[in-house]
Each structure stands twice: as structure tokens, then as C-alpha cells.
Amino acid sequence: MQLFVRAQELHTLEVTGQETVAQIKAHVASLEGIAPEDQVVLLAGTPLEDEATLGQCGVEALTTLEVAGRMLGG
């Protein structure tokens, strides 16, 4: 299935739904140079856990995930 990932740019990924959020972060890191530990992946504004698979998170075909950078400070 296709998945859209919006970071600094919009990327289209081909996934099975069995990938973990951590694997998506690693892929975004290779595309955009943002370290995985500095990324927050959001589905409809809700942060996703690294260990969860896309299927467990409710990600369906043609879903758009947002990738935000962690903010320093508080």
C-alpha cells in the first residue's frame, strides 16, 4: 500500500503495514537527514510509538503521516 509522509517535503512510501514506526523514522532519516530520535511521527495529530506497527496504529492505504522535529527546551 502507498503511504504519504510529510516532513520537510512530501514523500510517497510503498509499505505493507507490518513496518514499525521506528522503521519509518529510519527511512525519513535517510531521505531528509533528520535523526530518528529527533522525529515525532503523528497520525491525525496523535504521536505514534516507535515499537508499534503501522497496522496496529490504524494506518491505511493513502494515509498521510506527519513528521515533526522534537523541540529543545520546555
From Swiss-Prot:
<dbReference type="InterPro" id="IPR029071">
    <property type="entry name" value="Ubiquitin-like_domsf"/>
</dbReference>
<dbReference type="Pfam" id="PF00240">
    <property type="entry name" value="ubiquitin"/>
</dbReference>
<dbReference type="InterPro" id="IPR019954">
    <property type="entry name" value="Ubiquitin_CS"/>
</dbReference>
<protein>
    <recommendedName>
        <fullName>Ubiquitin-like protein FUBI</fullName>
    </recommendedName>
</protein>
<comment type="similarity">
    <text>Belongs to the ubiquitin family.</text>
</comment>
<dbReference type="InterPro" id="IPR039415">
    <property type="entry name" value="FUBI"/>
</dbReference>
<dbReference type="InterPro" id="IPR000626">
    <property type="entry name" value="Ubiquitin-like_dom"/>
</dbReference>
<dbReference type="InterPro" id="IPR019956">
    <property type="entry name" value="Ubiquitin_dom"/>
</dbReference>
